[in-house]
């Protein structure tokens, strides 16, 4: 029965990973009907719905209650994904912009409490996509971002929210582009509520060895995004990504949090433009086939990641 138990347990009765996907999977725009999307994801085997965090500030309390009630009934966890715009840049040279960013993230975390979401994930340390930076400004940007993130961390600690900082690639940010940088950044922030989000798509561009990077992150790994090197669903590009070895590394560090697919298969709309999807990666799939792709990928991930 839905809602009675939403944690997968391993053979020894210990909590293990839960699997899900980003809300935008079926769409061309950064919006959706969250209740219907949650139901569709549940039918595909998902245990996690990753929403757009900024949408929470646009939703009425009754809408937030409805989303929470639906996900509680389905036994689904909600994680909240953020890629702030430039007006909320924590690394900005303008103190007013940094203060605006801290307030923005604090307001989001307060809204997250209303739906029971405890994970805020993404490139909240700056803005996304970040395209107008200069290398010789990086040290100062780091200092500003870290000081602002310390303020965000205080709110996260008060609200029991985990902030997971996404390590991106060189084309989307200059703040955190590999795991070593993320570890150093988190150490400088110095909060148990600020950890790392690794994403196999970005790792495949920037890291030398994906399983070893997971081991390096260790207990700092708070969230994990998965996708093939071309942003297809895990398992769609046969042999391109070392999924079994990635799963082994996750088990070695006793990772027991969320694994969220972040696939982008469709051309068109704001999503296609922002993610740079210039050709159809779905093989002309209709909605039913898209459902099947997701269900097969979730099954694939569980087989590779869970003993």
Predicted segments with their positions:
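Active-site-proximal loop/turn and secondary-structure-junction residues that shape catalytic pockets
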Residues: 25-27, 53-55, 84-86, 126-128, ...
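Glycine-rich, proline-tolerant flexible connector loops at the mouths of alpha/beta enzymes
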Residues: 50-71, 129-130
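Catalytic-core regions built around general acid/base machinery
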Residues: 63-73, 151-152, 216, 245-249
């Amino acid at each position: 029965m839905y809602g009675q138990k939403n944690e997968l347990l391993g053979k020894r009765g210990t909590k293990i990973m839960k699997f899900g996907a980003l809300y935008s999977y079926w769409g061309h725009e950064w919006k959706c009907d969250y209740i219907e999307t949650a139901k569709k994801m549940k039918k595909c085997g998902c245990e996690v719905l990753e929403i757009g965090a900024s949408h929470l500030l646009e939703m009425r309390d009754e809408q937030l209650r409805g989303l929470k009630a639906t996900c509680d009934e389905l036994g689904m966890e909600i994680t909240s994904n953020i890629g702030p715009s430039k007006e909320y840049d924590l690394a900005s040279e303008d103190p007013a912009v940094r203060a605006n960013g801290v307030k923005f993230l604090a307001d989001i975390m307060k809204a997250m409490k209303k739906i029971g979401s405890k994970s805020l994930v993404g490139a909240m340390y700056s803005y996304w996509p970040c395209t107008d930076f200069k290398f010789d400004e990086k040290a100062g940007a780091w200092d500003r971002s870290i000081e602002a993130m310390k303020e965000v961390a205080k709110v996260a600690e008060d609200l029991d929210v985990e902030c997971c900082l996404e390590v991106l690639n060189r084309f989307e940010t200059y703040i955190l582009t590999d795991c070593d940088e993320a570890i150093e950044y988190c150490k400088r922030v110095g909060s148990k509520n600020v950890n790392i989000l690794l994403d196999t798509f970005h790792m495949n561009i920037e890291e030398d060895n994906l399983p070893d990077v997971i081991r390096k992150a260790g207990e700092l790994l708070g969230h994990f995004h998965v996708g093939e090197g071309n942003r297809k669903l895990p398992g769609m590009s046969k042999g391109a990504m070392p999924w079994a070895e990635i799963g082994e590394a996750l088990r070695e560090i006793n990772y027991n949090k969320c694994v969220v697919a972040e696939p982008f298969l469709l051309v068109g709309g704001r999503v296609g433009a922002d993610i740079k999807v210039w050709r159809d990666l779905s093989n002309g799939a209709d909605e039913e086939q898209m459902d099947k792709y997701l269900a097969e990928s979730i099954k694939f991930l569980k087989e590779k990641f869970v003993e």
